[in-house]
Amino acid sequence: MKISFIGAGSIGFTQTLVRDLLKVPEFQDITFSFHDISEKNLDLVSRLIQKDIEQNKLPAKIEQSTDRKKSLDGAKYIINCTRIGGLEAFEHDINIPLQYGVDQCVGDTICAGGILYGQRNIPQTLNFCEDIKSYSHTDALFLNYSNPMAMNTWAAVSEAKVN
């Protein structure tokens, strides 16, 4: 079985999720396929998780690629951990509303910042879903772990029609 992580360069999210999955016996003999646009982060997360696999003497395997289609090829599960625009865009999500007197506690899921974030993420989420339908297992399951959570999930299910 293969699990593909889109945005695997989100080191904290990816490492935590994989460590949790590796605690489940059914997921210990699996292929984790990591995709990210940052080769540097991709290499780092792959090395960290490979070390976890080796230290625990598990049969899990790792693939890594900056080619999303390659990572999605044959995947049964796809986990989205992306932050479209990175931290620089997130800063704008906070600061632009603040210029107009809208002080939001967090700008990644609610209020004006969440809407801005959604406008960046939804088109890319829909692109991911099209690739999932083309390259992944026929009954693949898309698991969104990226904010704005509700907006991305809604787009994937209602517009892109993925599981």
Residue ranges with predicted function:
Residues L126-N163:
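Rossmann-like dinucleotide-binding core of oxidoreductases
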Residues A8-F13, E39-N41, I122, N144-N152:
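Gly/Ser/Thr-rich loops at beta-strand to alpha-helix junctions
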